[in-house]
Structure formats: structure tokens, C-alpha cells
Amino acid sequence: MHVVEMMPEVLGAMDKETSGMLRSEYQKRGVNFHLNAKVIEVGKEGVTIEKEGKTALIEAEKVLVSVGRKANLSQVGLDKLNIELLRNGVKVDEHMQTSHPRVYACGDITGHSMLAHTAIRESEVAVNHILGVEDRMNYDCVPGVVYTNPEVAGVGKTEEELKASGISYHAVSYTHLTL
């Protein structure tokens, strides 16, 4: 089995140490990873990839394409309401309110993390705002979970994001063996 990933690491939005641990676990199980690579062609012989300007053929009988999701904004009628859109979804404020004062947006249509935990929290914030309860969306407080074996999860900014922002921090990590 081969995984072709355009990013420098699998699970690019997660902590690099966590992503590397998961990749290492799957390598032990015989999965081959091609990072910083992209698929050029899928043909009868297999998959042609490009990495660092060089092409290579990966022999394959079957191919699973999993390249992410995109908010489906067609046929929703947002144009009739003059709702402002961004490149990846509907523009919302910290209360999940769109540019139309009576329309709120939650879930995949907002173009954020597109995870169930995010959609649930966005919905809570929207309902609270509609009811007059003070609440604001903070994506740093929403967990991200990947249901692999082993499962991985995280919440908050990654160590890399904190370093890049110049924010001081104290890092602690636990594996299932130390809990």
C-alpha cells in the first residue's frame, strides 16, 4: 500500500510529532509514504507521481482518492440574499452570523476544519447568539480527532504554530502507553 501526500507530513494540520508517530506506526505495518509528492497520472500500470522534479511509477491495481472536502455552495440560493462568500465557504463572524443579519452558517459550508466537533460547536455558538446568550467561536478550543488505529487527537494550537507566533508555552504529550 502506498500513500501519496502533497504536504511534508501526513495530517498536515496536526502537530508534526503526532503526524510522524502515526506515519511511523503505519510504516511498521508495511505502508509506504511518498511525502511532498503529487499524482501526475493514474493509468493501467499504476500511479505516476512527481517528487522533487522527478517522476516515478507506483504499480497499483486499485486507487483510492481522498483529497479533502470543499463546501458545496451551489443551489443554496446565497446569491439571492447577497451573502458574502470567501474562497472556501461562507464568511461568518465570531457568532457564526453571515453578512445577512438573519442568516447564520455552521458546519462544512463555513470552510473551517470540516469536522463534526467543529460543526457542533459552531451550531452552539449560533443558537446562543440567536437566544441572546453571549458566546463566541474559538477554533483553538475545538478538538480534532482522526479515527485511525491508533487514534490521534489534538486541541489548541500546535507547537509549530506557537513557535511561529512567538507565544511562550509548555508542552506535554502523552501516548496511550503512559496514560
Regions found by a protein language model. Name each.
Residues 36, 172-174:
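Conserved beta-strand termini and adjacent loop/short-helix elements that scaffold enzyme active sites
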Residues 175-179:
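Conserved small/polar residues in nucleotide/adenosyl-binding loops
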Residues 29-31, 101, 167:
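A short helix-to-beta-strand connector/capping loop
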Residues 75, 171-172:
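Extended hydrophobic-aromatic, low-complexity segments
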Residues 84-86, 133-141, 167-170:
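A short alpha-helix-loop-beta-strand transition element characteristic
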Residues 57-131:
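FAD-site-proximal beta/loop scaffold in flavoenzymes
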Residues 1-44, 48-54, 114-120, 128-161:
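Rossmann-like dinucleotide-binding cores of NAD(P)H-dependent redox enzymes
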